Amino acid sequence: MSPWLPMSFLAAEDDSFYQHHGVDPVAIVRAFIYNLRNKASGGGQQGGSTITQQIIKQLLLSSERSYTRKMKEAILAYRLEHTVSKDDILQTYLNYIYLGQHSYGVEAAARTYFGKHASDITLAESAVIAGLPQAPSRYNPFRHPEAAKARQMYVLGRLRTLKWITEEQYQQAINEPLVYWSMPENRGGASKWYFEEARRLLVEFFTEENLRTLGIDTLKSGEEYVYTAGLTVRTAMDPVQQDAAGAALRRGLEELDKRQGWRGPVKKLSPAEVTEFREKSTFAPADLMGKAWVQAVVTAVDAKGARVLLGKGYTGYIPVANMSWARTPNRKISGWGAPAVRDARKVLNVNDLIMVSAAPVTVQAEGGKKGKAATKTVDFDPATASPQKPITLLLQQEPLVQGALASVETQSGDVVALIGGYQFGDSHFNRATQARRQPGSSFKPVVYSTALDFGFTPTSSVLDGPFVYVNPYTNEVWRPGNYEKNFRGIMPLYEALTLSRNTCTVRLAHKVGISNVIQRAKMLGLEPHFPQELSISLGAVAVSPLNLTQAYAAFANQGLGVRPRIITSITDNNGRELYRQDIQHWQAHTPQNAYQMATLLKNVVNSGTGSRARVDGHVIAGKTGTSNDENDAWFVGFSPSLVTGVYVGFDQLQSLGKQEQGGRTAAPIFRYYRSQIEDLYNDQPGITMQDGLAFQGVPGPGLSAIDNASEDPATGSSTPTAPDTSGGGEDLMRQMF
């Protein structure tokens, strides 16, 4: 860390640290007199605790204010001073002290307040951070910059009084501009979702009861214990996959948001605010690296595009082609193929504050045919930027729609990636684990898996036609229909799943019994309370994205269910293991059932509603899902080693827009993620055939009707019988794939 940090903390908190033995009587008397003088006037209070006492208070004792606690604090501080070196005590203090904004330790504080590592902190910045322990909220530089500056001046004054810095260093520090900002999301932002989920699980685990069971004698519990106990926590997160998942979800949500239309600028600036933007902007071309977004102010607009001010003399230009998506929102019109904007004046106005990113650049490449130069597209290079030449930009807009992505290794249950929303800084609500939404058709594999155990086969006949169900208890009538609002008649079971036909699924659930479907759902590990309602066969039950993703693992892993693992182990600061989650399997259904389901779900991706989830060169199986009124879009897909679930929807229930189904909205996000990480797994190009199964001859691909289905006139369900094999012994799997 920067040498200014320990020096600043010592000046602010305990300048005689290297002279006392854990307790400083002089400091206690000084604080008592200071507080007595300020009590009547309501002024600030001063603490007399040494750094050693503060460590004892934070790591071992509760935060109660009492003479008994202060006495314990003093005794333990004295003992600590005689067993641990001064340097180690100071190092521990700097690594564990709470500094506001969920930041513990100087490294976290440096990242939070100045967007840099502790090793890069200046004297002026060190004084700001060192001023925080007394009242992290009151001196928070984001919320109270004036108070933070005053506290910084106090710390710098102490350094000067102690002659630890020169007058020149003091003057330079007090005049140094302070720019407060946190490390942006694209630098470690995706991991915050995972770490916050792990933190939440830790707080839930370390209850007073569990601490007693573990034999831990402490007055702290929950969050207070987690932050101060010096725990070593191992998680199942794969940083490469976590970053890929975050980028994939952000890309998919931004694409959906653009299909929904332009909601307007961030703000309409007054002339005075434009002047302030121009003067205070800290823009540098490097800010646009990695497809990052920055703010800009529109300075001129015509039909062909808009000129914008970026700051520090740099300008940009947004051609109308780079804002062609920015139509007026209209949920009744599909964003797929909507008319493009052709006049920039219909989108932007002068003094609009907007978000922009650098447009890709077309450059010459090697090769070319028939005398034509070859070109390629590359990312913006800040080294090419100049104040004399506008930077070509893209108009951007932060999505309102949210989503989640969870990825689980099928054999271990390791949750290798977990993204809970578009941007962690906007909301810490983790939609992957905390949201409960209806999965729609992505629940259907539970029904089909049940049907396979009740005598149905992939070639069994099922009717896609009108279905009427009267609830015997309420007399309510339910008439489910298909998304396309049509019926296709009798079809084989595998085609009904491939095309996600609702009436076929309901008939299957009615035939095998909804209680058996619920039993299968629970065996797969699904956690909701399931009402005995036929509608749950179409996903009319709320479930979390991680829970649904985990349920699909059995289809990829020979019928073995697996418990998800986020935290794999916890050890204390003495190396004692406090918790370990071993791999936990159970037989959710037979390996034969799993093989058939995996094969059926491959067909959904190869030629059905999940075609946008295909990853070139890799075998993917999965199922799309869309809830009523296109409120929620899902895709859950897997290979033999990894299952990934994607959910997209608004936090407040509303339609995603016309034609925004799981196959169009969620499946591409799956592909963006899996195309980046698929090579990490050495999966074979197929799913292993299980004993007890045999390929069965069926009619060829031109199958138009099956005559061997008998329909129950009371229920409308079809009864499977042996399929007609007169069409020849074609291999079913070859027909499907």
Residue map of PLM features:
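Mid-domain, small-residue-enriched loop/turn segments at the edges of structured enzyme/sensor domains
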Residues: 476-479, 513-550, 566
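Active-site loop and adjoining helix of the penicillin-binding protein/serine DD-peptidase-beta-lactamase fold
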Residues: 77, 81, 133-151, 161, ...
